[in-house]
Amino acid sequence: MHRKLSFFSAFVLTFSFFISLPIYALDIKIDGVLDDADWSSAREWTKYYESMPFSLAEPKHYQKVLIQEDEKGMYFGFINEQPRESIRSNRHERDNEMANADKAGLAIDFDGDGPTAYGFTVSAGGSISDGIYRNENEVNYDWDADWDSATHIEGDAWFIEMFIPWSIAPMKSQKGD
């Protein structure tokens, strides 16, 4: 069984494309430490543009997102390299997009048709934000979904692990594989 998803980013990933993902059981512990064996076979994204503030500039520091999925949902591992003294790891209330903290996240168009996407963001301090994006510019932060995340700071990098269950949002029936 394969699912087709369109991924695009509200904050880190700034492009959209379709990928086909095979379904198999994974053993990833959401603890912010990307040391689980299943991460070694993950798909990777490494091309990003700065979107906050909106400049589309190349990022100053290396970033990578690892992607895995199984019958339960999707797993994302973020590697964000930057000097330790510059990492803003302040905790803040849920859905506070204006908080003074370093954040990384993504938005998923579960139907792959464009009008609606679900956003998931985690700060370096472990605070979360989620919302529904409609028509690319309308955001509703009243949607509080049940998903897992954890962060870890080590040396000159901070890490995020996320698990987003398939049941988190309604999806249209998919035709084909």
Model-based region annotation:
Residues 1-8:
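N-terminal secretory signal peptides that target proteins for export/translocation
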Residues 9-22:
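Bacterial N-terminal signal peptides
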Residues 24-177:
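Structural preference for beta-rich elements and adjacent junctions enriched in aromatics
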